[in-house]
Amino acid sequence: MNYMPIVIPEDIDKYFYNRNKEFKILNTNLEMLEEGIPNQFLITGYRGIGKTSLLKKLLKNLPDKFLTTYIDLSDVYGRQKGKLSEEEVIKEFLCLIEESIESNEKIVRTAKERLYDTLNQLKLKSYNFNNSNLRDLPLPIIKDNYNKLSKYVMELPQKVVDSFDEIKGFIIVIDEFQLLKNLENPEAFFWLIRSYTQKQYNVSYIFTGSVSNTAEINNMINGQTGAFGGRMFQLNIDEFSKQQTKEYIDKYSNNIKFDDEGFERFYKCTRGIPAYINSFCNILPNNMICTSEIIKEAFIMNIDNIALLWLRVWGTLTDKEKELIIMFVENGSLDWTSLVNNVSYTPVTLSHYLDLLSNKGIIEYSSDGKYYLSDIMLKRWLNLKKQTRGRYPE
């Protein structure tokens, strides 16, 4: 029996589909690290589009001459109960870079010893490492020594490359980068990274996240006045076309078949987004022709399974964020004046929450000056919950 995974599978190569073009683009540009050409990347796309799968596949298949570190900021955000500080992020960078060094058999014997020797040479206030676990490093110690530690962490990847002939480059992926907007001064943090990339020739950063194309954080990092000033290699991961969706289902599903109208409705529901395709296919009947009515009924009956990622996101939102989303559900796209007239708080507060939703990839801003929900699946899920339960989810 075939099963289409709704989480990233262990055997990522088995389920990798239709991202060969993007894979080759990234792989080719990263190979330039060996030549001292450090490209920096910004990868965006809808939730569930396959950004993380693409990057996991990319890192898995890179040659051993490249060290890689994968930093998922949602892990830090979750551990800190929705709060994020520069100190915690720097600590995460340090811990995961250390893990990358330790996992490389070519350098493990000497690298950790050098790492701690160098850290102790920083002469931090009231702290000595003594080969203790970096995870145990107290945040107040980092705060008191932030300038020293941030400089050390930012310089470390290039120093590793310079210290070992076998290592030709260091690649650092920062997933859910939009969470950096929660820092006290996110712009300063982006500029911190930028300032070191200008002096490093074998280190590449890959920022990725589910953010709107018009999100403020995109401009903050790669806009004309942003830290990287438009110099990042920017790649948006697109949805599957109808033909690609058909081929994907034929290859990986448990013999799911459609008539023409059934497939049209299925594609309209999923919009070619792999996460929705997988979860929907897993609940459809196999070895029979799925008609438009079968698709409609299955969608309504299983909306919580199909829109699972939005259930998770909804639980993390504030009341004001939910209030704004429901306003878009009930009214469609809205301009600034309409929004101001329909909320009970100040325009400054409204602007703050619109920025939050945009940076989370939930709303976008159109060329005609209106805000709207970026993913219609969220609207469908909320509407169906209201119809079946008489109220929106809390």
Name the predicted role of every residue range.
Residues P38-F170, L180, P186:
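P-loop NTPase nucleotide-binding core
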Residues N278-P347:
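Winged-helix-like regulatory helical subdomains adjacent to P-loop NTPase cores
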Residues N61, L192, I283, L356-K360:
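Alpha-helical DNA-recognition elements
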Residues M1-L62:
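Walker A/P-loop-proximal flanking segment of P-loop NTPase domains
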Residues V343-K360, Y365:
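Short amphipathic alpha-helical interaction segments
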Residues I376-E394:
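Short, amphipathic alpha-helical interaction segments positioned at domain boundaries
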Residues G369-D375:
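Minor-groove-contacting beta-hairpin "wing" of winged helix-turn-helix DNA-binding domains
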Residues V7-D11, I167-V173, F177-C269, I283-N287, ...:
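The catalytic "switch" region of P-loop NTPases
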